[in-house]
A protein has these predicted regions:
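Arg/Lys-rich, alpha-helical DNA-contact motif
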Residues: 4-6, 10, 29, 43-125
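Conserved active-site tyrosine of GNAT-family acetyltransferases
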Residues: 22, 41
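Glycine-centered, phosphate/nucleic-acid-interacting loop/turn motifs that mediate DNA/RNA or nucleotide
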Residues: 26
Length: 125
């Protein structure tokens, strides 16, 4: 099935201007256009847009996604390089996750500390 930008935007839950921005930034290298120059999206395009949104939430750099798009245009021979970009980003995410887990433990300890404090106050009143 094919979609114009308004329909595609509704499907992926983004405003059309965001999708246009992604294309301008080189993140959507395979978007086709109809005879009038309107963007045409297929299911694969929508899946990639959804992936971009997910990847951006992880903090990946636009430049890395742009590079992946450029490499994708070059074909399957660039799969190893694309995989390496994702592996590098995964490593950074795992390090960040360790930091977040440590911070979460500290927050949980503080919550427990304050719950104990509240409990002691209630028991003494």
């Amino acid at each position: 099935m094919e979609y114009h930008i308004k329909e595609a935007a509704e499907k992926v839950g983004l405003p059309p201007h965001t999708i246009r921005y992604y294309e301008q930034e080189g993140l959507l290298p395979f978007i086709r256009r109809d005879k009038n120059g309107n963007r045409i999206f297929n299911e694969t395009d929508l899946t990639w847009i959804d992936s971009i949104v997910c990847f951006l939430k992880t903090g990946i750099a636009l430049s890395q996604l742009r590079e992946i798009g450029e490499l994708a245009k070059q074909g399957e021979g660039t799969a190893t390089k694309r995989k390496e970009i994702f592996k590098e980003h995964k490593f950074k995410l795992m390090e960040k996750q360790k930091d977040l887990d440590k911070a979460l433990e500290k927050i949980e300890a503080k919550i427990e500390y304050y719950e104990d404090m509240e409990s002691n106050l209630l028991n003494h009143n």
